[in-house]
C-alpha cells in the first residue's frame, strides 16, 4: 500500500512539473516566435524599401522585383530555396497584398511603385529552425532531466510517506495485538455465561450476554482478518479454483437462511468458471455478499445471484431490492464501520464485512463496485480468470 502511495506521489509530482514546464515552454516559445517574426519583418521592410539587401550575408532573405507584366526577376537569393520556388512564392505573396506580412514560413514586405512594379523582400523562417542533431540533443537532455526529477521525487517520497507508514504500522499492530488479547477474556466470559445458562435456564439477560459475546468474537475475527489482508507479505495459498462449484456450495447454505427470512434466493451460474485464488478467502467474499444481501434486502423480496465469464474475467453479481440510498452512502459503502447518515438509511451500518470483501478482491487483482438501478442495490465483483494470471501477480 505504501509503495503504491509513493508511486502516486511521484506520479502527481511529475505530472504537475511536466504541465508547468510545458506551459512555460509554450509561453516562452510563443513569445520568442512573436519577436522573431517582428524583427524579421523590420528587416525585410527595410530591404524592400531600399531595394537593396544591405545586410549581412547570413540572413535567409531573397529580394525580387516584379514588373507590370508579372515577370519575376530575382535580385538575390540567400535562402535554401530554389529560384523556381522563390518566383512562384513571390507571385503568391503579391496576391496576398500589403495587408499581410506572413504567409506559410515566409515573412515578407512589398514595395509598390507608380508604374505598377513591385519589390518584394522575403525571409524564410524555416531556415531558422533548429538543426535535427541539436533538437535530438535537447530532447535527450529533457528526458534525462525528467528522469532525474522522478528519481528525486521518489527519494523525497520516502520522507513524506515515511511518517504515515510508521503511524499506520503502529495502528495495525495495535489492532492486531488488542484483538488477540481480547479473544481470551471474551471466550472466558462466554464459557462462564453458558455455565450460568445451564444453572439459570431461560434468563433473557444471560441470553443477551451470550449474543453480545458472539458478536464481539465475530468483530475481533474481522479485525484480525483485515489486519492479515493489509499485510501483503502474509502467506496465502493461491491455486486453481472452480468458482462455479464454490458458488453452488455457499448458495446451498444460504438458501435455507433466506427462506427463514421469507426471502427468495435465485441464482444463474455459468458452468466451469475458473479462477486462481485462495479458496477460503473467495468463500469469504461469497459469504459476506450473500449475508449483506439477505440482511439489507426488503422483506419478502427476491435476491438475484449470477456468475458468468466475460472479457477474460469472472463476473459475480448480487442484486436485491433495497431503499434508495444517496450518492454519499454509495460512495462510502466499502468504508470500515460506515454508518449511513441518510433519510432513507438512518439505521444502515455495514460494519467490516464489505471492507473485508474489498480487501480480498483487490488482493486477487480484482475489482468490486456497488451501484443502484432504481430500487435494486447491485454489488459486482470482477476477478481475473485462470490463464490471465502470471506467477508474478501472486503476492
Swiss-Prot record:
GO molecular-function terms, A-Z: ATP binding; phosphoprotein phosphatase activity; phosphorelay sensor kinase activity
Enzyme Commission identifier(s): 2.7.13.3
Key word ATP-binding present: yes
Residues that bear Phosphohistidine: 180
Domain Histidine kinase: 177-387
Protein's name in the database: Sensor protein DltS
Bilayer-crossing regions: 9-29, 136-156
Catalysed transformations (reactions): ATP + protein L-histidine = ADP + protein N-phospho-L-histidine
Source species: Streptococcus agalactiae serotype III (strain NEM316)
Chief location of this protein within or outside the cell: membrane
Function according to Swiss-Prot or TrEMBL: Member of the two-component regulatory system DltS/DltR. Regulates the expression of the dlt operon. Probably phosphorylates DltR.
One GO cellular component term: plasma membrane
Swiss-Prot/TrEMBL keywords: ATP-binding, Cell membrane, Kinase, Membrane, Nucleotide-binding, Phosphoprotein, Transferase, Transmembrane, Transmembrane helix, Two-component regulatory system
Record carries keyword ATP-binding: yes
CDD domains on file: HATPase, HisKA
Entry's localization field: Cell membrane
Membrane topology of the entry: Multi-pass membrane protein
GO biological process, any: cellular response to phosphate starvation
Pfam families in alphabetical order: HATPase_c (PF02518), HisKA (PF00512)
Amino acid at each position: 500500500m505504501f509503495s503504491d502511495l509513493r508511486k502516486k506521489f511521484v506520479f502527481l509530482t511529475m505530472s504537475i512539473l511536466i504541465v508547468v514546464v510545458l506551459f512555460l515552454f509554450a509561453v516562452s516559445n510563443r513569445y520568442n516566435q512573436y519577436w522573431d517574426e517582428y524583427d524579421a519583418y523590420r528587416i525585410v521592410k527595410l530591404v524592400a524599401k531600399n531595394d537593396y539587401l544591405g545586410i549581412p550575408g547570413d540572413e535567409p532573405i531573397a529580394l525580387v522585383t516584379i514588373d507590370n507584366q508579372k515577370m519575376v526577376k530575382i535580385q538575390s537569393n540567400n535562402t535554401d530555396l530554389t529560384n523556381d520556388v522563390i518566383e512562384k512564392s513571390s507571385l503568391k505573396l503579391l496576391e496576398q497584398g500589403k495587408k499581410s506580412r506572413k504567409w506559410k514560413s515566409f515573412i515578407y514586405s512589398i514595395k509598390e511603385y507608380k508604374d505598377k512594379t513591385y519589390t518584394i523582400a522575403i525571409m524564410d523562417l524555416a531556415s531558422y529552425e533548429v538543426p535535427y542533431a541539436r533538437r535530438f540533443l535537447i530532447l535527450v537532455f529533457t528526458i534525462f532531466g525528467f528522469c532525474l526529477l522522478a528519481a528525486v521525487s521518489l527519494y523525497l517520497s520516502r520522507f513524506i510517506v515515511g511518517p504515515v507508514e510508521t503511524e499506520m504500522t503502529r495502528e495495525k499492530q495495535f489492532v492486531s495485538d488488542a484483538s488477540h488479547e481480547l479473544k481470551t477474556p471474551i471466550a472466558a466470559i462466554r464459557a462462564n455465561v453458558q455455565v450460568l445458562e445451564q444453572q439459570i435456564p431461560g434468563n433473557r439477560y444471560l441470553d443477551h450476554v451470550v449474543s453480545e459475546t458472539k458478536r464481539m468474537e465475530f468483530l475481533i475475527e474481522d479485525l484480525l482478518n483485515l489486519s492479515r489482508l493489509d499485510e501483503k507479505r502474509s502467506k496465502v495459498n493461491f491455486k486453481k479454483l472452480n468458482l462455479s462449484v464454490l458458488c453452488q456450495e455457499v448458495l446451498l447454505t444460504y438458501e435455507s437462511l433466506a427462506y427463514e427470512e421469507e426471502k427468495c434466493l435465485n441464482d444463474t451460474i455459468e458452468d466451469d468458471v475458473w479462477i486462481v485464488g485462495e479458496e477460503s478467502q473467495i468463500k469469504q467474499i461469497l459469504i459476506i455478499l450473500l449475508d449483506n444481501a439477505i440482511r439489507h434486502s426488503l422483506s419478502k423480496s427476491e435476491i438475484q445471484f449470477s456468475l458468468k465469464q466475460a472479457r477474460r474475467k469472472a463476473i459475480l453479481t448480487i442484486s436485491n431490492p433495497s431503499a434508495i440510498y444517496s450518492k454519499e452512502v454509495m460512495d462510502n459503502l466499502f468504508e470500515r464501520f460506515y454508518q449511513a447518515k441518510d433519510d432513507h438509511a438512518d439505521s444502515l451500518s455495514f460494519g467490516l464485512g464489505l471492507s473485508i470483501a474489498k480487501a480480498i478482491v483487490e488482493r486477487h487483482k480484482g475489482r468490486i463496485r456497488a451501484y443502484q438501478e432504481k430500487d435494486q442495490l447491485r454489488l459486482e465483483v470482477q476477478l481475473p480468470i485462470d490463464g490471465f494470471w502470471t506467477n508474478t501477480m501472486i503476492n
